[in-house]
Amino acid sequence: VPAQPELSNDDVTLLVRTEDPFMKKIEQIDSRWFIRFSAYSADKGHAYWRHMDPLLCRHGVALALNMAFMFASEEFNVEMNAYEGKLKDNGGKPINLDALRQRIRSHGGLVLGRVVGVGGLGGGNTYGLADYCYKGVYFDATAPGSHPHSYPRQAMFHEYGHCLGYSHSSTMTYGNQWTVLCATVFVVMGQEGKLPVCSKEQVENLPM
């Protein structure tokens, strides 16, 4: 293609067309989160923050992809409808589910970090999890038939509840509402092969 110096960036659109099953799933994500990484205060002797490593970064990207994909799925949104009136904001008032969906879609993104001593830290774009939480959220990280609301999955969605602006006064962090809803759908979709990255082994078997 010959050079087109008269074209500006606004005149150009990049489209990627593929029949790859993974990319077909990615196309269904309706949020536009950025994904970044940070050591936060790891170099300043912070009690909780530590450096990410390459494997945790991979697990972090898989976690964010899976979470965004699940939130956009029909399976999740049908199940969430059953929680009408049960998801409460910081003041104890029922959350409008359509407003919550829009809040998820318009959330800026996640700056992923690693923590020790706690399961996670989150709020705004800050999203930190312990190693065992990054690696323990996949459906095959727990025994078949076990309750999907394991601690790593609870931490995963608890911290995202904080990222959406909800405190411990809401049902979006603790309790048997938001985190149970999310963990249950997440495990089922993983078992059925519907998530972009279903198994821990898909990440850990990649060459480093």
For each predicted feature, which ranges?
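Substrate/cofactor-recognition hotspot
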Residues: 156
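Walker B catalytic acidic pair
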Residues: 159
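Predominantly extracellular/secreted Zn2+-dependent metalloproteases
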Residues: 1-153, 163-208
